[in-house]
Amino acid sequence: MRKPETPARETIAPSDLTFGLSTCKRCLWLKYWFKFELKKEFPLVKPLADAQEEHFRRAPMQAIHPSLKPGIVKQWGQWVKSAPITINGFETRWKILGIYDLLGHYEDGTVGIIDCKVSDSDRDNGAFYAPQLEAYAYSLENPDRGKPFPVSSMGLLIWKLAGVTETRQSELASNSHGFGVNQNYVPVERDTDQFMSLLEELITTIEGGMPKSGAECNVCNYLIARAELDID
């Protein structure tokens, strides 16, 4: 396979620092050079996530969790783009481009990133999602244009479905039952050195030749098994 002279995209998606690197570097490489990736459909994820995010718009930060500093959620669902990423003193062609869920503005002038999750996955922990949140923080503190925002907190706001529960009728719901949730806020500690190391790994992977498939990549394993059937 001949590698194109220029990649199909020059911005890094924050989620590729979690799911991309940890799943399959070959699929990651194909995405950036050929814009070739498997499209996944999750019909319920977006409406559930939108409902969660809308609920906390303009909310006090301490309504999300008492440990957070005084402040208000003032921004949500906005794209952020970083300046070109510098690795080992060399400015690369790559920038981070992503969209955060909620951004709280603290009274001390700093901001807090809140990533919303409606899930029951064992991966809903700070360590797994830290690179993705760090990518948003990097873009806010090193923007492609405009003023930087210092980030003083990052965290996951997790809703886990807890079955059907009684609710009140309202302009949004016509019956008296709905899905209940248990809410949990998970603070995510910043680790800039680890984040820059992951960025270097990702950029090195993309800029190199096509890597091997990930051993547990469902897409690659399916394609290999399908080819081995030798069906016309």
Model feature map: region roles:
Residues 1-16, 143-232:
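Metal-dependent nuclease catalytic regions and adjoining charged, substrate-binding loops involved
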Residues 1-110:
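Metal-dependent nuclease catalytic cores that hydrolyze phosphodiester bonds in DNA/RNA
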Residues 59-64, 140, 144, 206:
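Hydrophobic, Leu/Ile/Phe/Ala-enriched alpha-helical segments that form helix-helix packing faces
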Residues 130-142:
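An active-site-proximal "capping" alpha-helix that borders the catalytic cofactor pocket
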Residues 116-126:
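Short beta-strand-loop-alpha-helix junction that forms the active-site gateway
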